[in-house]
Every structure is written in structure tokens, then in C-alpha cells.
Amino acid sequence: MSQANLSETLFKPRFKHPETSTLVRRFSAGKPQAMQSALSGNHVDHWYRLINRLMWIWRGVTPQEILDVQARIVMSEAERTDPELFDTVIGYRGGNWIFEWAKEAMQWQQKAGQEADPLLSGRHWLHASNLYSIAAYPHIKGDELAEQAQALANRAYEEAAQRLPGSLRELEFTIPGGSPITGFLHMPKGEGPFPTVLMCGGLDSLQTDYYNLYENYFSPLGIAMLTIDMPSIGFSSKWTLNQDTSLLHQHALRHLENVPWIDHTRVAAFGFRFGANIAVRLGYLEPQRLKAVACLGPVVHGLLVDPLHQGRVPEMYLDVLASRLGMHDASDEALRVELNRYSLKTQGLLGRRCPTPMLSGFWKDDPFSPEEESRLITSSSADGKLLEIPFNPVYRNFDHALRQIARWINHRFG
């Protein structure tokens, strides 16, 4: 089936699809507060979703494209779940978040199909994949339209990978007690086996969102990158996040000695946001398999145990947490009790000495991850490095931090 026909089949209207903001029914949703975070985006009045401009632009979407799609959503007069929130248009039609971003993606998909230059075609496919991923954002379980957009993001990513430099292999990992999962191994040019970074992404992202990290930061150093979806989304959708947060990544890590393209003696883990919870946990549980752990804006303790901290983050992020845990109908109190168990300090790990070298980067006044969170990680490591990232200029400092982290990891590979 052609990619165009797949799009038509997946998005063919069959019934009134549930609107994203209604899928998690927490009983005590609070009033949203203004918030700004480099890594997670801004909470802007009249939007349910966090508008994550930094990450979207970093992935290759232009500021103008973001504004154009937002404008189409704002201007829609279609029925909304909440008339106060622009991105709650009901049904797959003009003004609906998923519709507008998928429509943008389809234009790039069409360009990719018409482009004779394989490299340029690959770039267009990658752009389409990024846009489909934003369409599916924040990837809440049970959002049928978003899951269809995820499928298109993955298909477009596979098309892109066939045309872009280096090579990509899909690896299947068997997980005891459940369905296997699929990861993407990105390899630079040259002869393997390659030192490899195991990427642990945020709860609101797909594994296909990190190609730029591989291409611009790891590949130039001759480092491969393995991505795996977080539990409950993408290729890991049949798994629910539980207190053993690193379960899927740990099984993948243990399997790497059987992958001929990977130098399993030189593997590091890199975690964004909640992905840092997985990466740090692996640093404690698998020190013999990891040369280093790096984190950015980690969520490992404070947000998980402090109700005041939880009260400062937007509703969307709490909905994402509830969705990953399979708690779609829970009260905030029940969610708090459960989240407390996900703290690596509560689990008896953080605070104990860890032999694995650990770097943690943070932004001052980050509502998701205060400085103390990163200090807790680095002070627990026998070889810890704290990295403060100035907020402005946000894009340049983010790029500089990623280059520092890539060099630090490469140095730990020896």
C-alpha cells in the first residue's frame, strides 16, 4: 500500500473520535498556570498542549510552519470540547490539532514522493515524520487519531532512513511476559562495531523524534544511537509504565552483546526528562554494561514526591503521566500516591553510591526539574558532573549543552 493510500485509509472518518484532552479524566484538575521550560515547552493561555517550540525547531520544523498551523487551529469555528482551549476541536476536521499537523505532514510526504534526489527526498520524509509526531503529541493512550498519526510517523521515518547518510536497522527485542518491542539502531558510516548511546526519551515523545541528536551530535564522533519507545506509546504501546521503569530498556541493553554492529563494551545511556529516570536506574542496575549515563532536565525524585511541585506543572503533563501509568480515571490524590513509588530515592537507589559516571544538565528555575534534582544524581555518582545550561539564547545554549554531553560520553568510551 502506498504511503498516500495508507494516510487515506488510516484517517478515513468512521465515527466521532474522542478528543485528546478528554481521554484522561482526573477528578481534581486544577487551574492552569503560566509556565516556561526550555525542554518541555511553554504553557500558553488557551492551549491544552504545551507548545514545545525549542524541540520542534531543533527537530527541523520552522518557526513559521509552527505559527501557520497554530493560526489554522485558532481560526477554526468548529465545536470544541472546551471553548476556552484552541486545540480541543472535536473530530478529524479543520482546526483539530491532529488534522492540521497531519495535513502539513502530508504535503511534505507528497514532496518526498516527487523529489528525484534521494537525499533531499529523505529530508522531506524526515520532516513529514516529525510533523506526524507533533500531530500525535502528547501521545495519550486511547487517542485513536493520534495512534494513526504515530503509525504514519514511523512509516515516514523508515522511508527517510533508506535515503539519509549512514544506515538504520530495526531490532526486535523479546521481553519476558509480554509483547516484543522494536528499536531503531542508527549507525554512522564506517566499519562497526560502534560505541552506542541508548536513548531514553521523554514521556511525551516518540523514538523517531531524536534523529537530529544522532545526526548532529553522535554520528560525527563515530557513535551509533539506539532508540526505544517509552512504555505505552509507539512500538512499546502494549506495555504500561510501572515502577520498574527501566524494564524495556534493560532487556534491550542485555541483548546488545548479540548485536554484531554494536560494541557492547562501550555503551552509554542518555535520558531526557522522565527518560533520565530510566537511564539513571540502569546506571545503578547495570553498571557493568554502561560506561556512562547522561541526563537533561531529569525527572527522578522531586516532581514525583512533592504535591506542590506537581501543582506547578501543566495539566497536560499530569495527564501524560496518568496515561503512561494506565490511570485514566484516577483522582489527583491516587496519582500522587502512585507517582511517589517512581522516585529513585524512594526506591532506595539515588543517594546510594553508584560506580557509573553520571552527568546531569539543568536549567535554573525549570518547573519540571530543579537544580537539586541534577545535584542528587551527580553527587550519588563516583564520577559525577553537573552542567548548568543558561536559558538565553535558548537554542544556542541547548545546542552547546548537547555538544558538551556528546564529548563527555565519547571521553567515557575511552
Curated annotation (Swiss-Prot):
Coiled coil: none annotated. It catalyses: a carboxylic ester + H2O = an alcohol + a carboxylate + H(+). It is an enzyme of class 3 (hydrolase). Its EC number is 3.1.1.1. GO terms for molecular function: carboxylesterase activity. InterPro entries: AB_hydrolase_fold (IPR029058), FrsA (IPR043423), FrsA-like (IPR010520), FrsA_esterase (IPR050261). It comes from the Bacteria. Keywords: Hydrolase, Serine esterase. The keyword Ligase does not apply. Disulfide bonds: none annotated. NCBIfam families: PRK05077.1. Catalyzes the hydrolysis of esters. Belongs to the FrsA family. This is Esterase FrsA. The lineage of its organism: Bacteria, Pseudomonadati, Pseudomonadota, Gammaproteobacteria, Enterobacterales. The gene is frsA.
